[in-house]
Regions:
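Extracytosolic ligand-binding ectodomains
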Residues: 2, 9, 16-18, 24-358
Length: 358
């Protein structure tokens, strides 16, 4: 009858409404929100927008609707970074990708320790436990160089580093990685002084004089075929061994090239010792310096980087940059760690031993 039909319909729609509400609540509960603190206004707006695009590209590639990115504009200002981070925390967010620049991490230790920042900086700051430096820092690079030393049986590396603001970061990397060095030299990066400093530390003038003395000795000797020996000696630049089998040039751009060129001038070319430097994958001009080849350095997976650039360009019809590339990887890293932890947001996933490498 009509009464029974009405009762049935009321029960049916009540159950349907309940299931819909339950499904909605489950959907909300299952949503994983990740903060993104970047400059979206001001002079660094273009950089911030590129990072945002890269993060959205990563989320699209992950293809999991439970991941939601909440971007906030920090205006590249430390105080604004603190404020927007508080807002994100109040919204229940416990993982934030960003900020980009180290200065914007200055006030973040005022926030709760269960709010984790994956900062783009490569500067290591052990005093701030809730900030993870996600950039390619000196520790990871020296660890990679250690592996390269082992694989290539390099045992006596001489470190050359500039006496500038980056020296503290380099020293942290040396200490934490426990890399073995034959010796180290910190130079003044003034281009007018570099060659003289390299001459001194490599004993160039002594080795040069050794050659002159040897030529003179052979000239005054009664050795057989001394003319041939003299001709061979005159093809050399120096005589005398060096007590290292490799150089680690912890510098960048033109100063790096100046130091490498000075080493070649002092008769220590890359065919004689192995040239190693820090991360240079973004500097294509280094590959054009034929004299200093081969030179080895830690790098991202170059093939994957090229694939990313192509995908970004196809998606947005614009070029990405290195920082945006890092944000793409960070998004994938966060998702991977959450996946391993059954999507339970817990700061410990970033600190447990062997949870991830980077």
């Amino acid at each position: 009858n009509i009464y029974n039909k009405m009762k049935y319909l009321i029960k049916f729609y009540t159950v349907l409404i309940f299931l819909t509400i339950f499904s909605f609540k489950s959907s909300v509960a299952d949503t994983i929100k990740i903060g993104l603190v970047i400059p979206l206004s001001g002079e660094n707006k273009e950089l911030g927008e590129s990072v945002l695009k890269s993060v959205r590209l990563a989320v699209n590639d992950i293809n999991d609707e439970s991941i939601v990115i909440i971007p906030k504009d920090n205006q590249n200002d430390p105080l604004q970074t603190l404020e927007v981070s508080k807002e994100l925390y109040s919204e229940g967010i416990r993982i934030i990708i960003g900020p980009i620049f180290k200065k914007n991490t200055n006030n973040l230790d005022q926030l709760s320790d269960d709010l984790i920042f994956l900062s783009f900086t490569n500067k290591v700051d052990e005093s701030k436990k809730n900030i993870i430096s996600s950039g390619v820092n000196s520790i990871s690079q020296f660890n990679a160089i250690k592996k390269f030393q082992t694989l290539n049986k390099i045992e006596r590396s001489y470190l050359f580093a500039p006496d500038t603001s980056i020296l503290d970061e380099i020293k942290i990397g040396l200490k934490k990685s426990k890399i073995k060095l034959k010796d180290k030299f910190f130079y003044d990066p003034d281009p007018t002084l570099i060659t003289k400093q390299i001459e001194d530390v490599t004993r160039y003038r002594i080795r040069k004089q050794n050659l002159a003395d040897e030529i003179k000795r052979v000239e005054n000797s009664n050795e057989i075929n001394k003319e041939k020996k003299i001709a061979q000696l005159e093809k050399l630049d120096t005589i005398g061994g060096i007590n290292f089998d490799s150089v680690i040039l912890a510098d960048f751009e033109e100063t790096l090239k100046s130091v490498a060129t000075s080493l070649i001038y002092t008769d220590i070319p890359p065919r004689r010792v192995t040239y190693i430097t820090l991360n240079q994958w973004f500097d294509k001009s280094l590959l054009n310096e034929k004299m200093i080849q081969p030179i080895y350095f830690p790098s991202v997976n170059y093939d994957n980087y090229q694939k990313y650039l192509k995908r970004y360009n196809n998606y947005y019809e614009s070029k990405s940059n290195q920082i945006a590339f890092l944000s793409y990887d960070l998004t994938g890293l966060v998702y991977y760690l959450l996946f391993k932890n059954d999507f339970i947001v817990d700061s410990r996933i970033f600190y447990e031993k062997n949870s991830f490498k980077g």
